[in-house]
């Protein structure tokens, strides 16, 4: 078989290609692959890259080699390599876990081991605690640490907290693995299994393997590389460093990468595999900008020398706050798109913490009409479909009025806004709660003291039909989840059911409420309105929920648990679900976090948040193990992630990669204050730019003067600037007013702006509207005049819109007065007509009781469904009314 030769003419199994950022390592691989496509027709050619870089690599190879030649090369991530091998070896036999199912199993593992734990005994439904455990589990698996290895390490430690932690972690880890059994496959184990089956599969035997764009490898990935070294004819690995000699003794910007290179060489040497002399690429092929080259060469070096010439390609910006920073970024991108031959995909925005910028940066880009792709994880618990499901489960455990109203307002229960308002007004008026939702309502919909007419009876009948339509599917769900519960106390029931029964009950509820149809209608409406991204999200939410129910039924199996516990676990699984984002445009600004982002040859890069402790970030605090404990375990042979000192070094590497990413232009911004108004200082990253490039462009934002057009990059910007300059007597203000006044569609907005800016009194512009609200003739009482002068808006609401404050149907002072007046007006004329001689106080009491009970029956729906407080207050009213009537009779 023909062997590959390195560039020195000798044969090698491991070839390292070294070079700093921009030195052309990836291009070197593409050129090498291009040559091998023509000369090595019999051997597999593989290019292994990080998962998030695979699409870009495939596209680049397609553009460089053409479709026919590019088809000879397999572009794989480690995950895709595992999938490829498992398809041939049968490694997919089992149900694969996702984050939601993993959360369920960890919660159950904690529950199973609770009696053996002392340190890790928190609540098994606490999402943050479970996430911490899963994070620790992920680290252990990626570091190829088994439960047995943890247990052995715990026994080797002296008695103390760390020994207890290691022992308890091994118990939890072991319980988790036991739950996996032979039924489930944890993707976190894929690379471990891949390393085991690779030698037997023979699929990659004799391959020419190129590994590119990794900054380091986990222990699992090193195990896979170890197996590949024994199978492939050559393994070529690129590393972002120009040397393997770590003169900085572990503290340099390339120290983490150098450690990776040395580990690879040691791995090959232990297996007696030859290692070629590294290929070192020294020329920067990315940029010709002197300023950008200086940053790449000298950043984070103690003896870096400043560039004394102008450095206009680099801009250092001091921003007032995060909002000014994002606005500046969006407007600058818009300006560059307008002024230069640039496309959105030529721009990249880098932050250290994407969550900090979510809702601000994307809003600023949308304001400027700039397409972007921001792959973020969003909380789906507030989505209507998820909300109606969780509300239904909680309502089944007890008829909570607030939850029932929330369920109706999701828009998926089939109730119109008018119906929801009617129900809400009624339940608030009559204080309906608990079991009151399951009984026919009898209270007057118009209030406690309103007459009960035929029209009122129709309203009440309509409300009861709405109530039954809401409650009936929930009662079916309740009877499945709590079959032995009484109507009053479901939480006391000892009912247990399987995860399959639980999932089936939830699906039946969604079917009865026709939630799927409502989702389809919403998707169609959003599509018609042009909201295609939101429509796609709603459609995927339904698929996600059904997948979650299937996964829940499978993960819980036949184990019988209380319904409340199953509800907790199902909520956990939904909380861990990731709907993901789908790019809506091929030409979009790329936004990413510095530790995960893979740059696709951006011409311009914006680095945001170059503040102390933000970027570079301080080492993460917390976690289940302290730095000291982590170091002790590493010294005992457990290959855990490095402690915080090494994290600090890695942060500098992330900053270096961001600084060296652009080919033409770099913007670095830092904030002067946070949301609380506290002062923020520039970080080492910003200080490095300032020190190495003393003549770079420096800006402070906001910078616009009132008479300036600066910063106006869109129609929205221009309207906002006009509002700011409304009272300014400048040429810019006049020009903007003239520009928008000439647009008929802007007339209403300008009028509204003028009224607000000039503080003009609110008045009817259309007399017909005033007549419709107040009539042709207005009759004004003294109380109305008093209300008008007290609050004009309150007067308008009360007498124009005829809005009444919602008032509970209870015997308050107003109802008391109405009822007392009714008693007096009903009985006193009778007594006067019949004569007062012989009238006794006992008869007055009897007549008063009869009159009040008649009033309550006719106008308040009777006493049968009234609470004890109502009856008590009614007795007080009877005594008071009777005494008052007797006093008047005596007078």
Residue ranges of each PLM-predicted region?
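Short, Lys/Arg-enriched N-terminal segments with co-localized hydrophobic residues
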Residues: 2-12
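Accessory N-terminal region flanking or inserted into the helicase ATPase core
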Residues: 10-17, 112-213, 220, 224, ...
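Conserved P-loop NTPase-based nucleic-acid remodeling module centered on helicase motor cores
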Residues: 42-152, 160, 796, 819
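Conserved Walker B
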Residues: 213-215, 354
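Catalytic acidic motif of RecA-like/P-loop NTPases
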Residues: 215-216, 595
């Amino acid at each position: 078989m023909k062997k590959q030769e390195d560039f020195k003419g000798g044969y090698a199994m491991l070839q390292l290609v070294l070079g700093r950022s921009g030195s052309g390592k990836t291009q070197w691989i593409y050129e090498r692959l291009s040559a091998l496509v023509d000369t090595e027709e019999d051997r597999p050619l593989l290019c292994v890259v990080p998962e998030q870089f695979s699409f870009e690599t495939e596209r680049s190879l397609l553009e460089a080699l053409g479709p026919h030649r590019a088809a000879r090369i397999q572009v794989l991530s480690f995950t895709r390599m595992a999938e490829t091998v498992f398809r041939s070896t049968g490694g997919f036999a089992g149900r694969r876990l996702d984050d939601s199912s993993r959360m369920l199993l960890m919660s159950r593992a904690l529950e199973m081991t609770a009696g053996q734990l002392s340190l890790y005994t928190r609540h098994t439904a606490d999402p943050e605690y479970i996430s911490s455990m899963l994070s620790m589990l992920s680290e252990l698996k990626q570091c190829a640490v088994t439960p047995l290895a943890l247990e052995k390490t715990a026994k080797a430690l002296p008695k103390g907290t760390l020994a207890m932690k290691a022992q308890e972690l091994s118990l939890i880890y072991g319980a988790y693995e036991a739950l996996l059994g032979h039924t489930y496959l944890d993707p976190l184990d894929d690379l471990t299994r891949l390393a085991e089956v690779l030698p037997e599969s023979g699929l990659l035997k004799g391959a020419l393997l190129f590994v590119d764009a990794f900054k380091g490898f986990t222990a699992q990935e090193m195990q896979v590389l170890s197996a590949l070294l024994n199978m492939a004819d050559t393994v070529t690995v690129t590393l972002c460093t120009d040397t393997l000699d770590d003169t900085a003794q572990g503290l340099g910007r390339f120290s983490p990468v150098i450690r990776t290179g040395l580990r690879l060489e040691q791995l090959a040497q232990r297996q007696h595999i030859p290692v070629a002399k590294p290929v070192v690429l020294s020329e920067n092929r990315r940029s010709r900008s002197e300023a950008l080259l200086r940053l790449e060469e000298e950043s984070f070096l103690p003896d870096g020398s400043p560039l004394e010439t102008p450095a206009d390609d680099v801009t250092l910006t001091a921003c007032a706050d995060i909002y000014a920073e994002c606005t500046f970024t969006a407007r600058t991108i818009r300006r560059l798109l307008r002024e230069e031959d640039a496309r959105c995909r030529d721009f990249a925005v880098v932050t250290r913490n994407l969550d900090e910028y979510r809702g601000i940066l994307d809003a600023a880009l949308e304001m400027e009409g700039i397409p972007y792709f921001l792959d973020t994880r969003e909380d789906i618990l507030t989505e209507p479909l998820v909300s109606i499901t969780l509300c239904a489960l909680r309502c089944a455990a007890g008829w909570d009025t607030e939850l029932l109203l929330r369920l109706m307002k999701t828009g998926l229960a089939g109730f119109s806004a008018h119906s929801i308002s009617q129900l809400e007004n009624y339940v608030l008026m009559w204080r309906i709660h608990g079991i009151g939702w399951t009984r026919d309502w009898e209270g007057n919909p118009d209030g406690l003291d309103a007459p009960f007419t035929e029209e009122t009876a129709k309203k009440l009948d309509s409300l009861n039909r709405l109530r039954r339509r809401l409650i009936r599917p929930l009662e079916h769900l309740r009877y499945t989840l709590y079959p032995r519960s009484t109507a009053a106390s479901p939480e006391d029931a000892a009912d247990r059911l399987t995860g399959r029964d639980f999932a089936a009950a939830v699906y039946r509820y969604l079917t009865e409420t026709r939630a799927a149809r409502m989702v389809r209608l919403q998707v169609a409406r959003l599509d018609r309105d042009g909201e295609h991204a939101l429509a796609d999200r709603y459609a995927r939410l339904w698929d996600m929920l059904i997948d979650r129910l299937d996964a829940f039924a499978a993960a819980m199996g036949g184990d019988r648990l209380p319904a409340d516990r199953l509800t907790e676990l199902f909520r956990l699984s939904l909380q861990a679900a990731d709907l993901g984002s789908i790019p809506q445009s091929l030409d979009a600004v790329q936004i990413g976090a510095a530790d995960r982002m893979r740059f696709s040859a951006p011409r311009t890069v914006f680095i945001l948040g170059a503040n102390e402790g933000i970027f570079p970030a301080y080492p993460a605090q917390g976690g289940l193990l302290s730095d000291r404990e982590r170091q002790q375990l590493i010294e005992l042979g457990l290959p855990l992630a490095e402690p915080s000192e090494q994290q600090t070094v890695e942060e500098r590497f992330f900053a270096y990669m961001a600084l060296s990413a652009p080919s033409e232009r770099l913007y670095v911004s830092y904030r002067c204050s946070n949301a609380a108004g506290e002062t923020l200082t520039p970080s080492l990253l910003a200080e490095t730019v300032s020190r190495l490039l003393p003549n770079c462009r420096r800006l402070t934002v906001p910078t616009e003067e009132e008479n300036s057009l600066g910063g106006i990059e869109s129609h929205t910007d221009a309207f906002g600037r006009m509002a700011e300059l409304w009272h300014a007597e400048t040429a810019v203000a006049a020009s903007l007013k003239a520009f928008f006044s000439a647009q008929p569609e802007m007339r209403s907005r300008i009028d509204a702006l003028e009224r607000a800016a000039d503080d003009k009194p609110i008045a009817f512009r259309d007399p017909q509207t005033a007549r419709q609200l107040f009539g042709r003739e207005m009759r004004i009482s003294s109380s109305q005049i008093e209300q008008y002068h007290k609050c004009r808006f309150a007067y308008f609401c009360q007498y124009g819109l005829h809005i009444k404050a919602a008032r509970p149907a209870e015997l308050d002072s107003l109802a008391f007065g109405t009822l007392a007046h009714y008693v007096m007006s009903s009985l006193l004329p009778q007594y006067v007509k019949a004569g007062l001689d012989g009238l006794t106080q006992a008869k007055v009491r009897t007549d008063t009781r009869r009159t009040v009970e008649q009033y309550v029956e006719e106008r308040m729906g009777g006493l049968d469904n009234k609470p004890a407080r109502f009856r008590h207050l009614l007795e007080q009213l009877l005594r008071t009314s009777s005494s008052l009537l007797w006093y008047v009779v005596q007078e």
